[in-house]
């Protein structure tokens, strides 16, 4: 029996890993181990490790990075704390392989430690491109330290083959987030209205805006304000805003939204995967710069206004309109989508 350790650092990435975890948990030849770190252990970002436990899984190690995102100096400190603590966790758990997904900076101390411990790394969703964030560099660094690669598209696989200089151990598996639509029974509109205190007769919009980590804090706050200025005054529309990731600038964006919350602008730290996908299926439009607008929303055929450069370089489907972050541009594209 092999110890396969799945490491998760964010609410969104756990949602993508959920059904992979489920399959591993049922394999008689696998001893599943789960490590939760990053924003999962942060009060500011919703203590989302509870979603993992609610799904019936045991978390074998909780690595509190003492995560703070108010300034750039706090994040490297948190990464150093994570590296120290994860080394003790790996020494105790003795994983034969770790499984990680994506491009979050929280993964760097994980894969660095695994590399030093000579633990093979399986990386999901390598080979993608996101030009507007440091995620690109993180993703490629993780790729170079990994032994197994599971890209979502053939296009991404081509990039991996070019980067790695080999064809071996690269398997195109599709986008794991789409599995949830096949496995979940989505909630009804009336159930969502009751849980989120919304008016089911109004139009609903889903908003998720993360910081562009290659831009300044002022730029990111201006982008947020530009979107809010477009949202206010819309008649018969309610917006649900899910808070930004634990990137530099994320805390300030979240504080901005908290200050703007009212009956028609609902702000939540996290909806959880089932409510998030269910709500997405009921909205008139998805606004912001989340990867879910690029991957999951097209599966549902929901219109998307993708703002700014965070997702620049990704494959864009026909239902997605990309625009710059200026208020005039955002307003024009949003109104064209919900009119």
Label for each model-derived stretch:
Residues 52, 187-282:
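Donor-nucleotide binding loops and adjacent catalytic segments primarily
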Residues 100-101, 108, 123, 149, ...:
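A donor-sugar binding/catalytic signature common to diverse glycosyltransferases
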């Amino acid at each position: 029996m092999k110890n396969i350790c799945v490491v998760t650092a964010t609410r969104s990435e756990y949602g993508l890993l959920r059904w992979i975890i489920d399959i591993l948990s049922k394999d008689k030849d696998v001893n599943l181990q789960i490590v939760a770190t990053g924003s999962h252990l942060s009060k500011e970002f919703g203590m989302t490790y509870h979603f993992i436990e609610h799904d019936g899984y045991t978390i074998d190690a909780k690595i509190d990075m003492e995560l703070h995102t108010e300034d750039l100096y706090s994040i490297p400190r948190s990464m150093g704390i994570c590296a120290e603590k994860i080394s003790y966790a790996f020494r105790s758990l003795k994983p034969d392989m770790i499984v990680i997904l994506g491009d979050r900076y929280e993964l760097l101390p994980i894969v660095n430690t695994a590399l030093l411990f000579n633990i093979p790394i399986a990386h999901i969703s390598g080979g993608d491109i996101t030009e507007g964030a440091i995620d690109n560099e993180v993703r490629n660094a993780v790729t170079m330290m990994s032994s197994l690669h599971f890209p979502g598209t053939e296009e991404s696989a081509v990039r991996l083959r070019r980067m790695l200089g080999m064809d071996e151990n690269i398997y195109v598996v599709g986008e794991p987030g789409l599995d949830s639509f096949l496995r979940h029974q989505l909630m009804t509109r009336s159930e969502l209205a009751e849980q989120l205190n919304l008016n089911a007769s109004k139009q609903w919009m889903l908003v998720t805006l993360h910081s562009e980590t290659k831009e300044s804090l002022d730029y990111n706050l201006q982008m947020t304000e530009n979107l809010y200025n477009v949202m206010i005054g819309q008649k018969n529309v309610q917006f649900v805003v899910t808070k930004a990731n634990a990137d530099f600038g994320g805390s300030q964006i979240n504080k901005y939204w908290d200050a703007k919350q009212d009956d028609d602008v609902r702000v939540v730290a996290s909806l959880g995967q089932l409510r998030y996908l269910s709500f997405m299926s009921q909205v008139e439009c998805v606004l912001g710069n989340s990867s879910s607008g690029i991957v999951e929303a097209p599966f549902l055929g929901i219109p998307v206004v993708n703002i700014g450069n965070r997702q620049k370089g990704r494959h864009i489907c026909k239902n997605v309109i990309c625009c710059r972050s200026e208020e005039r541009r955002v307003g024009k594209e949003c109104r064209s989508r919900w009119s």
